[in-house]
């Protein structure tokens, strides 16, 4: 980009909230940073993405957004003013011209529990929010403002979606303070700090620290080995109170044959997507992203085809007096 890229200080612990619990944008948290060689190289790769005919969904997306030209400072102010007045075309232009900014920021959050396309999708929501609230008369560039919103939506998604049990955002932020303090103490003390040591460092009650740390305990997988010399997993010793008998198994086989017959009443694309998503016709059940990668479509397009296919299948099943929800669990 011709303008400076922007760096936003870590806002997880310092963010302020209004009376409705919505984070308040902090202009003081923004610092301009000259673009690095890596950033410039990444920009060049993104611009070349449109010419690469690769089936990988991420590369396809990068190619698509490569067609959108960047805005000059003057164009940015022009379109931002029109967007504030409700001009839909200007709003869309602001969004499309900054999609590469979202990709660059999303890549910094790799290996945090979410796939890159999911990070980009969350970041795009932040970009849309930034376009809706940006006031060009405030004196700073749009990328400054948008970076803050993009990072907030991505970080919140990581907090929410990478936990088996979701916690309120204010609890997650407080927990992060305790965990960061625990990491710092572990380096100083050469051992894992106790709740008492963390509480003393933060001047907090020990009971509060212990309660918060328990929220971070991991859920044990039923596939995890029991330990010792045993090769059995927890799942192997749990009784299945709902195990199907012979009659149920026969009914299930008949139902599977019927599902295959109904699938072939869909068009080829709908049939393939549903088969890959739900593990039918010899396929293993797969995520939207994995299906998109296999058949050369974006995650969003796969989702749309799935919705269309399920809608058509629902119509077919209704004529049989059946409910599709009993067949597919998403």
Curated annotation (Swiss-Prot):
Region (Sigma-70 factor domain-1) residue spans: 56-89
User: Is Transcription one of the keywords?
Assistant: yes
- Pfam families documented for this protein: Sigma70_r1_2, Sigma70_r2, Sigma70_r3, Sigma70_r4
- Which GO cellular component term is one of those annotated? cytoplasm
DNA-binding residues: 288-307
Q: Where is this region: Sigma-70 factor domain-2?
A: 94-164
The family this protein is said to belong to: Belongs to the sigma-70 factor family. RpoS subfamily.
Domain of life, per UniProt, equals Bacteria
> Which keywords fit this entry according to its UniProt record?
Cytoplasm, DNA-binding, Sigma factor, Transcription, Transcription regulation
The entry describes its oligomerization and partners as: Interacts with the RNA polymerase core enzyme.
Please give the residue ranges the record annotates as the region Sigma-70 factor domain-3: 174-249
Q: Where is this motif: Interaction with polymerase core subunit RpoC?
A: 118-121
User: Where does this protein have coiled-coil stretches?
Assistant: none
Q: What is this protein called?
A: RNA polymerase sigma factor RpoS
Q: Which HAMAP family match?
A: Sigma70_RpoS (MF_00959)
User: Main localization of the protein?
Assistant: cytoplasm
């Amino acid at each position: 980009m011709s303008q400076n890229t922007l760096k936003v200080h870590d806002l997880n612990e310092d963010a302020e909230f209004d009376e409705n619990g919505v984070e308040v944008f902090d202009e003081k948290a923004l610092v301009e940073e000259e673009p690095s060689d890596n950033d410039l190289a990444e920009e060049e790769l993104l611009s070349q993405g449109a010419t690469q005919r690769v089936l990988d969904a991420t590369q396809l997306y990068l190619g698509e957004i490569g067609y959108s030209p960047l805005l000059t400072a003057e164009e940015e102010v022009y379109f931002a003013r029109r967007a504030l007045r409700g001009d839909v075309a200007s709003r869309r232009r602001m969004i499309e011209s900054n999609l590469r900014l979202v990709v660059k920021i999303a890549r910094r959050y790799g290996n945090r529990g979410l796939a890159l396309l999911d990070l980009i999708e969350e970041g795009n929501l932040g970009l849309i929010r930034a376009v809706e609230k940006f006031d060009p008369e405030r004196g700073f560039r749009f990328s400054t403002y948008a970076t803050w919103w993009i990072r907030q939506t991505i970080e919140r998604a990581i907090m929410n979606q990478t936990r088996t049990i979701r916690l309120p955002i204010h609890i997650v932020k407080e927990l992060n303070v305790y965990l960061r303090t625990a990491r710092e103490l572990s380096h100083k003390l050469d051992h894992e700090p106790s709740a008492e040591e963390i509480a003393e460092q933060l001047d907090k009650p020990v009971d509060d620290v212990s309660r918060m740390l328990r929220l971070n305990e991991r859920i044990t997988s039923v596939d995890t080995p029991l330990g010792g010399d045993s090769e059995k997993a927890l799942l192997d010793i749990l009784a299945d109170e709902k195990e199907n008998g012979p009659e149920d198994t026969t009914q299930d086989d008949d139902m599977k044959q019927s599902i295959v017959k109904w699938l072939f009443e869909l068009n080829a694309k709908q049939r393939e997507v549903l088969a890959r998503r739900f593990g039918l016709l010899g396929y293993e059940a797969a995520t939207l992203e994995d299906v998109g990668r296999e058949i050369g479509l974006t995650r969003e397009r796969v989702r749309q085809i799935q919705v269309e296919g399920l809608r058509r299948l629902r119509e077919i099943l209704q004529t049989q007096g059946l409910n599709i929800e009993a067949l597919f669990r998403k």
